[in-house]
Amino acid sequence: MCSSHLYAVYERTYATGRWRALASKGARPQRLLWASTGTKNPAYSDTLYVDELIGRDTVNTVPPQTLDAFRDHGRVSHTLVEDVELAYDILSRLEQVGISLDEVTDGLLADGLVLFEEAMDGLLATIASLQRRARGPRVTPSSLHLGDALEARVTAAAARWDQASGTQRLWDRDATLWTDSGEERWLGWLDIVQAQRGQPNTFKQVAADVKKGGFSDVLLLGMGGSSLCPDVLARTYGKALSAGKSGKSKWPRLRILDSTVPAQVAATEAAIDLGKTLFVVASKSGSTLEPNAFMHYFLGRVGRALGDAEVGSRFVAITDPGSALERFASEHGFHKIHHGVPEIGGRFSALSHFGMVPAAMMGIDVASFLEEAEHMVQACRPGAAALENPGVALGLVLGEAALCGRDKLTLVATPGIASVGAWIEQLVAESTGKQGKAIVVVDGEPLSRPEDYGDDRLFVYLRLRSTPDAAQDLAVEALEQAGHPVVRLELDDLDALPQELFRWEIATAVAGSVMGLNPFDQPDVEASKIATRAMTSAYEQTRSLPSEDPLFTSEGISVFADGANAEALGRHTSLSGWLRAHFARVQAGDYVAILAYVDMNEEHERLLQGSRLRIRDAKSIATCLGFGPRFLHSTGQAYKGGPNSGVFLQITAEHATDLDIPDHRFGFGVIADAQARGDLSVLAERGRRLLRVHVGSDVVAALEALDRALADALADA
């Protein structure tokens, strides 16, 4: 019916006087094309979408088998002009029975665009792969567009680095390259690729075990450095591997749980089949609060679903030797325990078992992955001058940019590898955010016009040459032309991503040296853990968290702040008034961070991104968006240990339901609330500008209301 209607519109268009005038000058009509017209429903005629779509000046792209069927028994007739009045009548009555043609066609258009985009990306990726095989391996190239001032600083820093034999000292594990406070104990990541390549059978066996188990999902339970690299791998490679594309067998879908928010835990559980899921508990120390809570929760759930005898066979641990988790896993009969390397800190552990065991479980060819990383390892070794060393050069740029005020490292990445930004964010922010200094990583902030950015930005563009984003290319080119410093990292294809893991680890270590910091410690992370333990201890004694009084409450939304911030903000009679006063404190060179302790789903992220951009555009400053408690193991160190240039908006929510945890005296809701309030108290102790907004359990409605209040608050900014 729709086709007949469309064809009638088409014919009317080419019968107009306007078209006849064009035709008289040689214009030719564009033909209507009917695509994907094979019949998929066996209840229909195999020539249905050919028989019914015949008309003058049309094209029909049919599969070969459909064409053969039409030759054999198709019906040849000008069918598109038959029963046109009936088509109009049916279409006019659709709304009466609750069918919106606009909604249907809008949905089909959106779905079709995704399918064509995926097909095009797949074609380009195949071409890139063939090109890679023909050309052979190469190190991902980079280019620097820094502007005169920063370029001069980097050139001078490179000369000093080379004169001091900086690269050799790094590989020699010379702690004096940093602060001489034990840094040499945390450099095991320098040799991890070589060590991992020496045990290929380990990863083959991991993959074989998963296949043998017939698992549909692998659920990794972890936080921070133990979960972020697997999350990148899952988001980058998981869809193709779990779908079994390119004729390959299907692999389990790798999922990550790194939030104590009850709604997030519940949503994750709802997405899996407990009987077909392998659970991976990842924790270097083996004593981290969140993974242990996740582990006990799912041990209980699996035991109830399958029986206690089956539980151990469904769990794997990744942890350092001698940890509490190793002991627990041994006592409870876990299927396997994989050891980390004690000389590698969590955020530098991507290429150790913490990244590579989950990689093998989801079907990644770990041997090829590590071989790709090895190209960057060799390029970063001593021998070349600093600016010819891809990791050292990037690190010098990051460090010098931060020292001259360009401390907002703004990541831009082709959509296919966008998830690597969260891993870089943790690596760089947690390594450099201390002693009043920090490289503040801005990840996931959509690009704007060059004039919307201040002089505190450094842009790094991770571009996939195989499937680039044209809009990003134009925006980054405009930034360069406007004089903003830009570093370009040109990845051939998805297979080049392993190189970036090692490049950024080297770069972070070098940046720490330039900034005079120890990049391997995290002195301020423990403060939030202590505050959280104080909150949960209070709950164990009183069955409630310490009471607190809101500064303002209206329509289910309450505002909280510590005494110093409350005094600085004054008194207001509306949510927009409090927000206006809070963001009036933003100054040039500051950044705003939204810290949201809500379920990390697409709808919440969309709404929070809208609020984030509203703040950025109104105040012309850098913005960060983090979901709690995930960010506590990432940017939380920089927020507390870095300069007092952050303005924080914390968002917490009522929990529609809580989830009890076996062997714990409290559920996930209490943990999440204690983490939020504990971290806020530490930020307050550090004199940070902060405001907390607490909303009801209808988070979508609350975030929409918050955004409306923000719009009002920032209208005259």
Model-derived regions: residue spans:
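A C-terminal functional module that forms or caps the active site or interfaces directly
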Residues: 44-96
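C-terminal extensions of enzymes
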Residues: 80-136
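Extended, charge-enriched "interface" segments that sit outside catalytic cores
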Residues: 136-214, 466, 474, 488, ...
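C-terminal amphipathic alpha-helical interaction region
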Residues: 137-140, 521, 526, 543-547, ...
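Glycine-rich phosphate-binding loops that contact phosphosugars or nucleotide phosphates
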Residues: 208-384, 458, 462-467, 473-481, ...
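Extended C-terminal subregions enriched in glycine
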Residues: 468, 591-623, 627-630, 640, ...
